[in-house]
Amino acid sequence: MKSDSDLRYETLLPFLSEERTQRFDAVLKGRTRHLSVVLENIYQSRNASAVMRSCDGMGIQDVHLIEDINPWVYNRGVSKGTPSWLTLHRYKQQPDPTGACIQNLRDRGYRIAVTSPHVDGFNVDDVPIEEPLALVMGTEWKGVSDRMLQQAD
């Protein structure tokens, strides 16, 4: 099944110059699914949108949004259209959005790393990246949930 981004790209192709098509292809080949970003209940939608822009700029294709407490609202001024080019996995309608995200990542072979200034762990330069890795960022105020922290590898 093709993603929304794939369908958008295929729709645009007939209208693009050869040079532009080559540029798109080069950018898409630079994308990775080896590293994914998870945003857990980010309070300020503009912060989530800014992270998405960073993911787009670094070639990270998949962004997972856990929205059981704080829903993400599209912020055009900050995101600059990047959600159209990323694959967004939204967890908000399930009975357990955090659990659904964790299960999806585990089923796809991801290890889970959380960002936290409050726990001992790896320095960012020492994080093992041999296997697919999901990097989890929590709310601006409290950070990642206890549950997500317990699930971290």
What do these predicted regions represent?
Residues 1-153:
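Post-transcriptional modification and biogenesis factors for structured RNAs
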